[in-house]
Regions:
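Conserved phosphate-binding catalytic cores of ATP/NTP-utilizing and phosphoryl-transfer enzymes
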Residues: 1-10
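Residue-level signature of catalytic and energy-coupling elements of molecular machines
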Residues: 11, 44, 119
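Short, glycine/acidic-enriched loop or turn micro-motifs at the edges of active sites
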Residues: 14
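Short beta-strand scaffold segments in enzyme catalytic cores
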Residues: 17-22
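Phosphate-binding glycine-rich/basic clefts of nucleotide- and phosphate-handling proteins
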Residues: 23-109
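Short amphipathic alpha-helix initiation/capping segments at coil-to-helix junctions
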Residues: 101, 108, 112-115, 142-145
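Phosphate/ATP-binding catalytic cores across multiple sugar-kinase/actin-like superfamilies
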Residues: 107-134
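Glycine-rich phosphate-binding loops at beta-strand->alpha-helix junctions
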Residues: 130-146
């Protein structure tokens, strides 16, 4: 962080995410958004209800997130899979389904998109012109895993 290049730090908490860029020994940008692990868990629960017809609780959603949660779908195939147990939405009978990383990338697209947006500052007027374009283009979320 002492060099004239930047390092982006993303701290995803339960209720908020902090995004900061550190350079030349200090913080040159920061933003907080009200998106965190809790919203991701909620997104997983909603996805499973809507697309798989199964109801799961918060603890199950968090376990799924930790096992196969990803911001980017695998380049080839569907990625790793896990078995999820819950209750069928129609009759409440215990049920299980197989879900994969590709599904989780889709489920997490909205909350991850909000976090990614917090990291996009190239167009923000207070930073425009302060950094060379290659400095800004080097910052991003290419490998954001939850």
């Amino acid at each position: 962080i002492e060099e004239p290049s930047g390092s982006m730090v993303v701290d995803i908490g339960g209720g908020t995410t902090e995004v900061a860029v550190l350079s030349l020994g200090g913080q040159v940008y920061s933003r907080s958004v009200r998106v965190g692990g809790d919203k991701m868990d909620e997104a997983i629960m909603n996805y499973l209800r809507k697309h798989q017809g199964i109801l799961v609780g918060e603890m199950s959603a968090e376990r799924i997130k930790k096992q196969i949660g990803t911001a980017m779908a695998p380049e080839h195939g569907d990625g790793m899979t896990v078995t999820v147990r819950g209750r069928a939405t129609g009759d409440g009978v215990p049920n299980e389904v197989e879900i994969n990383e590709k599904m989780m990338a889709e489920a997490l697209a909205d909350p991850v998109g909000e976090i990614v947006e917090a990291g996009h500052f190239r167009r923000r007027s207070k930073l425009r012109g302060q950094f060379p374009s290659d400095y800004l283009s080097g910052l991003g979320f290419a490998n954001l895993f939850v």
